[in-house]
């Protein structure tokens, strides 16, 4: 319940900079990472982790040799995530901006990520920030990698993500309140 009130307070203070009124449910969190073959994943990046419900699912499933980079801009959320996942040697919680992701990974000796999991409210971003985000994703995502994006607006943004990716699928999760889902996007387009 503490996470809910922290999240709600951030939402009212920062509006659409916070993706939701509340943290993702366990069902939505599992749906968002359901396509990841955990035994083969080498690098997973999570953007906008908030209080960490998706991060927890990643922690429960990832093997110890897989590097997990969690990027969170909000200092309170980043501090909370560092505390929650301090015992995970393969986890690195970074307080920072998504536009700096390439440098953040390079500083850690990482060239590419197998999966980028996003809890960011991307469609609410200004157009230039959207383009910046997907330029960075194009730089860091392995050619066979997937960009996983959670949404509380089921199916509404299919066309939006198709502007940036060759292949976009959507999985609905009705048990989340409000009903939500995840987009699974592959093949970042050359230009957008």
Swiss-Prot record:
<keyword id="KW-0808">Transferase</keyword>
<keyword id="KW-0489">Methyltransferase</keyword>
<comment type="similarity">
    <text>Belongs to the methyltransferase superfamily.</text>
</comment>
<dbReference type="InterPro" id="IPR048196">
    <property type="entry name" value="Ornithlipidmtase_OlsG"/>
</dbReference>
<dbReference type="GO" id="GO:0000179">
    <property type="term" value="F:rRNA (adenine-N6,N6-)-dimethyltransferase activity"/>
</dbReference>
<dbReference type="InterPro" id="IPR029063">
    <property type="entry name" value="SAM-dependent_MTases_sf"/>
</dbReference>
<dbReference type="InterPro" id="IPR020598">
    <property type="entry name" value="rRNA_Ade_methylase_Trfase_N"/>
</dbReference>
<keyword id="KW-0949">S-adenosyl-L-methionine</keyword>
<dbReference type="InterPro" id="IPR020596">
    <property type="entry name" value="rRNA_Ade_Mease_Trfase_CS"/>
</dbReference>
<dbReference type="Pfam" id="PF13649">
    <property type="entry name" value="Methyltransf_25"/>
</dbReference>
<comment type="function">
    <text>Catalyzes the 3-fold methylation of ornithine lipids. Forms ornithine lipids that are mono-, di-, and trimethylated on the delta-nitrogen of the ornithine head group.</text>
</comment>
<protein>
    <recommendedName>
        <fullName>Ornithine lipid N-methyltransferase</fullName>
        <ecNumber>2.1.1.344</ecNumber>
    </recommendedName>
</protein>
<dbReference type="InterPro" id="IPR041698">
    <property type="entry name" value="Methyltransf_25"/>
</dbReference>
């Amino acid at each position: 319940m503490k996470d809910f009130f922290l999240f709600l307070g951030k939402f009212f203070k920062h509006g659409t900079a916070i993706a939701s009124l509340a943290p993702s449910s366990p069902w939505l969190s599992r749906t968002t990472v359901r396509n990841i073959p955990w035994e083969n994943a080498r690098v997973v990046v999570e953007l906008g982790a908030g209080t960490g419900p998706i991060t927890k699912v990643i922690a429960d499933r990832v093997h110890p040799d897989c590097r997990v980079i969690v990027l969170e801009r909000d200092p309170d959320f980043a501090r909370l995530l560092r505390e929650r996942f301090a015992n995970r040697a393969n986890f690195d919680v970074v307080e920072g901006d998504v536009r700096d992701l390439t440098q953040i990974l390079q500083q850690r000796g990482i060239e590419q990520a197998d999966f980028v999991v996003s809890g960011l409210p991307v469609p609410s971003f200004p157009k230039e920030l959207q383009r910046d985000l997907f330029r960075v994703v194009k730089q860091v995502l392995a050619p066979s990698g997937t960009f996983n994006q959670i949404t509380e607006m089921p199916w509404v943004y299919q066309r939006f993500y198709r502007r940036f990716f060759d292949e976009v699928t959507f999985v609905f999760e009705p048990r989340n309140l409000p009903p939500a889902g995840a987009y699974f996007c592959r093949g970042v387009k050359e230009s957008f």
